[in-house]
Amino acid sequence: FFHELAHSYEKPYYEQIYEDGFLAKEFKNKRNQLKNVISMYEGGRTPPFDFNEINYSKELDDYLANTIGYDKLWKYCAGIFTNPYAATSLREYFAAGFENWLKGDQEVLYRSSPVLYNKLKQFF
């Protein structure tokens, strides 16, 4: 429910959430951290995707979910993303953070995703 509620905020508040580019920059930095972690633990192979792409990609989602697998992805995302699905796109990153906020995990969000935390703070 919270996740879909987050997506309903995106259209009316698009400018506040995305327009300044700061959230996209934070997301890209995290994506590249994840790419480095995956490369390190998956035999030194660089994942065959553009980790700077902020939009959803079914191919990347399949790679993360099926080639890497969520069991390993949870470990690889630790300290980078609040959950593996947050890594799939900028919109999912926002929605996952929104969900964390509503579940009371603001401190984790503050430490791991300060830009996202400050965006969400505007709403609450």
What would you call each of these model-derived segments?
Residues 1-124:
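Active-site-flanking segments in enzyme catalytic domains
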